[in-house]
């Protein structure tokens, strides 16, 4: 009898329509669950009053049989680097601890127009600089799949959008918004066992997303199924007059075929050999191998391809990231908004002290390194050079996607090299090494601006999610997510099966 | 109306399991695999031991601190800076003759321009609300044109 309640947004929506469920009740439950799982530290700030008010409005719309969309009344969480009108937006930093934006990011306002309920703002690495959600002034986010949530024995959620991933994985909301500059959506999705989509660069507006690396940043989507992910994408994607870097052609809403209608016989899957790098765990390798095999069994053409500049990508990414960070962070001076130090000796002194107090070591070092790489004597050697190699990396992709007779439609790779690491092992590494290892497979897609999705496949020996990544050419989300949906149906990964969640429910 | 309870989740798990297809066997393959079973040789050998050539002197550090308006406040930070520069050095030998820089992946599309007219505004109070110190309708800063005081000369 309750079969229709298997947590897909579609089923919740139809239950709202026929009155078996109500947005208010679902939201109340979500708030309660979020409070009872506070130990995860997924949220920087819950917005229960706002959420319940929005849920009530949604409920009235359903009573009048006039829901705004399929997402009406669905609780959603947003990473705390997206501006939310009159709700503090901190970037998990002291610098923006008291910042209250007067406006909504486009992603947030489109979700509002669709009638979603904002459950709260989620945790991240300070200014989204990290791969673990361990560098937040509000403390680290824990992974719901951890064997043990106590002391230092828990697993990291991944990052930088770890709070959003953790919230979806723990069943606190149906979807969440993150951002993805080098893998910040796909990496935590991989560790937390949820779907994580990085759309084509320019498909989703960045207006109101506090910038990290403008030439790579995209809003990302977390959901427990590919179908739910598509519903969110359909609401937030498309041109925006407030972001001149959005792609101008109108967005055609995606509509995925039913699983049994998906025909893989005309689809060509590429396995880029360079993505088997040192440090890839045997379990991830076996997962990658098996999924390539079942795709081939289903009739897809599977072939090995080469993206020769892959290994250079992480270095190029690191250079461009630090250069753009040095420039982007120049806006924080304490005068117009954000933290202001008590130092009135001079303007420069105020700026310096404000920034010394407002940024953590990771942010400061990236600014200093970025400015070193941008020095007049270094500009050609590092910054320009990195942009040239970036073109080679992007061309690697266009060659495999567009070479006439051998073109592939989809690339299949690991997302992360391992299962979610233990906090104590991860925090023993420097931030640079954390990112260099964890972003190996994810950041090339940001270099080329192409869409990529991480989907959970199975559990490791330790009972932790193992995920794979699919990539395709720009604006090919329809095919990318169709293949993702097919794999999802074959592997039957259960997003809400974690032991900690079951313990919390008793 | 159904009461939402935690039990629903539990129910869903059972419901999902009942029609679960046989779990995949990850050791069985039906085709010769295209996935490389050995790692690709690393094109960028680890240079981290090579810390001798000091790329950065104290004058440069002072310049960086002035440009960045953040302080390089510890040995640890200096070490990270040096190792980040070495990390960046890994790409300098990649041949890029006649390869133009890729500034944006949207280079083939025209940037959207709008008419030079006011479309929104009248939000002075909202903007000033986030400043810590204001005077009437102004932001306030301490005296300018005074160079940053730097220690560790």
From Swiss-Prot, chain B:
Keywords, alphabetical: ATP-binding, Ligase, Mitochondrion, Nucleotide-binding, Protein biosynthesis
KW Ligase (keyword) present: yes
Reactions listed under catalytic activity: L-glutamyl-tRNA(Gln) + L-glutamine + ATP + H2O = L-glutaminyl-tRNA(Gln) + L-glutamate + ADP + phosphate + H(+)
One of the GO biological process terms: glutaminyl-tRNAGln biosynthesis via transamidation
Organism from which the protein derives: Drosophila willistoni
A GO MF label: ATP binding
PANTHER family per UniProt: GLUTAMYL-TRNA(GLN) AMIDOTRANSFERASE SUBUNIT C, MITOCHONDRIAL (PTHR15004:SF0)
Function: Allows the formation of correctly charged Gln-tRNA(Gln) through the transamidation of misacylated Glu-tRNA(Gln) in the mitochondria. The reaction takes place in the presence of glutamine and ATP through an activated gamma-phospho-Glu-tRNA(Gln).
Gene Ontology CC terms, in alphabetical order: glutamyl-tRNA(Gln) amidotransferase complex; mitochondrion
Protein name stated in the entry: Glutamyl-tRNA(Gln) amidotransferase subunit C, mitochondrial
């Amino acid at each position: 009898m309750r079969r229709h309640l298997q947590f897909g947004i579609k089923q919740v929506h139809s239950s709202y329509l026929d009155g078996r469920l109500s947005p208010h009740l679902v939201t109340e439950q979500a708030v309660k669950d979020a409070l009872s799982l506070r130990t995860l530290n997924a949220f920087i700030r819950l917005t229960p009053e706002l959420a319940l008010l929005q849920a009530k409005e949604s409920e009235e719309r359903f009573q009048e049989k006039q829901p705004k969309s399929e997402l009406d009344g669905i609780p959603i969480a947003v990473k705390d680097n997206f501006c939310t009108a009159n709700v503090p937006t901190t970037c998990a930093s002291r610098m923006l601890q008291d910042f209250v934006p007067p406006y909504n990011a486009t992603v947030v306002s489109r979700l509002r127009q669709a009638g979603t309920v904002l459950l709260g703002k989620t945790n991240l690495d300070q200014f989204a600089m990290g791969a673990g959600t361990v560098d937040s002034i509000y403390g680290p986010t824990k992974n719901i799949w951890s064997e043990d949530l106590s002391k230092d024995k828990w697993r990291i959620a991944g990052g930088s959008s770890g709070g959003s991933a953790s919230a979806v994985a723990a069943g606190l909301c149906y979807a969440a918004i993150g951002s993805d500059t080098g893998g910040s959506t796909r990496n935590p999705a991989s560790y937390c066992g949820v779907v994580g989509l990085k759309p084509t660069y320019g498909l989703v507006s960045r207006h109101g997303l506090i910038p990290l690396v403008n030439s790579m940043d995209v809003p990302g989507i977390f959901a427990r199924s590919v179908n739910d992910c598509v519903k969110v994408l359909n609401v937030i994607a498309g041109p925006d007059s407030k972001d001149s870097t959005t792609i101008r052609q109108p967005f055609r809403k995606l509509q995925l075929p039913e699983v049994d209608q998906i025909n893989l016989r005309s689809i060509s899957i590429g396995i880029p050999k360079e993505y088997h790098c040192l440090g890839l765990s045997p379990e991830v390798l076996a997962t990658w191998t098996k999924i390539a095999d079942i795709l081939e069994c289903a009739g897809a053409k599977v072939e090995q391809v080469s993206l020769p500049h892959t290994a250079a990508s992480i270095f190029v990414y690191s250079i461009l990231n630090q250069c753009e960070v040095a420039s982007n962070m120049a806006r924080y001076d304490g005068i117009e908004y954000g933290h202001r130090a008590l130092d009135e000796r001079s303007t420069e002194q105020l700026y310096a002290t404000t920034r010394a107090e407002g940024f953590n070591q990771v942010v400061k070092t990236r600014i200093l390194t970025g400015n070193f790489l941008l020095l007049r004597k270094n500009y050609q050697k590092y910054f320009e050079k990195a942009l040239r190699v970036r073109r080679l990396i992007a061309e690697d992709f266009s060659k495999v996607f567009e070479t006439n007779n051998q073109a592939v439609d989809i690339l299949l790779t690991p997302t992360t090299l391992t299962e979610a690491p233990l906090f104590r092992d991860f925090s023993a590494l420097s931030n640079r090494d954390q990112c260099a290892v964890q972003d190996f497979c994810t950041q090339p897609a940001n270099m080329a601006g192409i869409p990529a999705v991480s989907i959970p496949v199975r559990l490791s020996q330790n009972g932790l999610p193992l995920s794979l990544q699919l990539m395709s050419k720009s604006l090919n989300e329809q095919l990318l997510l169709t293949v993702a949906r097919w794999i999802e149906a074959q592997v039957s990964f259960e997003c809400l099966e974690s032991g900690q969640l079951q313990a919390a429910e008793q | 109306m159904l009461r939402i309870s935690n039990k629903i989740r539990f129910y869903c798990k059972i419901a999902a399991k009942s029609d679960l297809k046989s779990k995949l066997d990850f050791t069985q393959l039906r085709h010769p695999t295209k996935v490389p079973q050995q790692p690709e040789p690393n094109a960028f050998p680890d240079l981290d031991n090579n810390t001798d050539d000091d790329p950065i002197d104290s004058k440069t550090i002072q310049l960086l601190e002035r440009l960045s308006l953040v302080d390089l406040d510890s040995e640890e930070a200096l070490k990270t800076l040096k190792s980040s520069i070495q990390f960046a050095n890994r790409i300098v030998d990649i041949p890029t003759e006649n390869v133009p820089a890729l500034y944006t992946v949207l280079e083939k599309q025209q940037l959207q321009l709008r008419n030079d007219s006011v479309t929104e505004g009248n939000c002075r109070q909202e903007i000033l609300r986030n400043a810590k110190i204001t005077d009437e309708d102004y932001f306030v800063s301490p005296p300018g044109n005074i160079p940053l005081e730097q220690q560790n000369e």
